[in-house]
């Protein structure tokens, strides 16, 4: 199936928001390779509406029984805030080469993988209630602070496995007191949640 392309020039933009709504599905987010582009988005039909205004790139899905597959590439010279509104299903966000201001899924995250970059300072990551099969991978030099509201099942934090944890959960990595990392807040009822560091390639 053919894909239609949306793009915009980067210009002198230094920070921007990507807002996807309602309900991202089968979406890949990664770094843009063309240095003069702010972003490039490609989607199968039915096409979502894509617009740029006031420092925000908006992707608005149309209501349809058909699932729209797509990808969004973000300029690696721009600091991005990513907001997924109305849920997220099968989202692969490889932001290892993209500076991140924050990452926010308001509800219903399912089968989401987020890979993030090295950084200075602390960056918030928020995953709304009812998250399932969510994986967050950071560089080994970056710290992590995890806060889960009212319990979690099948939680893995930096190699530590927990079958079920009742009540509020707070954990932090040994690197959490150093230069920076990721402040991860997850809503109630999380299942199959993994927070890990990236493995070094062999050889």
Regions found by a protein language model. Give the residues of each.
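Aromatic/pi-system hotspot detector in well-structured domains
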Residues: 89-90, 153
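Short acidic/polar, Gly/Pro-enriched loop/turn segments located at secondary-structure boundaries
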Residues: 18-20, 28
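Envelope-exposed proteins and targeting segments
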Residues: 14-16, 80
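Extended beta-solenoid/beta-helix repeat architectures
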Residues: 74-79, 85-88, 94-109, 117-122, ...
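RNA/tRNA-interacting regions in translation and RNA-turnover enzymes
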Residues: 23
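Short secondary-structure capping/junction motifs at helix and strand boundaries
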Residues: 26, 91-92
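Short, surface-exposed interaction patches in beta-rich subdomains
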Residues: 3-11, 29-34, 38-71, 104, ...
């Amino acid at each position: 199936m053919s894909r239609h392309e949306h793009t915009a020039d980067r210009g002198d933009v230094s920070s921007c928001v990507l807002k996807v709504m309602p309900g991202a599905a089968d979406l890949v987010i990664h770094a843009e390779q063309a240095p003069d582009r702010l972003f490039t988005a490609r989607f199968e039909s039915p096409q979502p509406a894509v617009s740029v205004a006031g420092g925000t790139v908006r992707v608005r899905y149309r209501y349809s029984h058909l699932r729209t597959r797509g990808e969004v590439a973000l300029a690696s010279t721009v600091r991005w805030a990513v907001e997924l509104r109305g849920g997220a299903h099968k989202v692969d966000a490889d932001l290892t080469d993209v500076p991140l201001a924050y990452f926010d899924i308001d509800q219903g995250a399912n089968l989401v993988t987020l890979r993030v970059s090295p950084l200075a300072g602390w960056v918030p990551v928020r995953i709304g209630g009812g998250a399932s099969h969510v994986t967050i991978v950071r560089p080994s030099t970056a710290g992590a602070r995890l806060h889960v509201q009212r319990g979690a099942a099948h939680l893995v934090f930096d190699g530590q496995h927990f079958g079920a944890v009742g009540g509020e959960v707070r954990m932090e990595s040994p690197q959490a007191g150093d230069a920076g990392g990721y402040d991860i807040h997850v809503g109630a009822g999380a299942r199959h949640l993994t927070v890990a560091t990236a493995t070094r390639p062999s050889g």
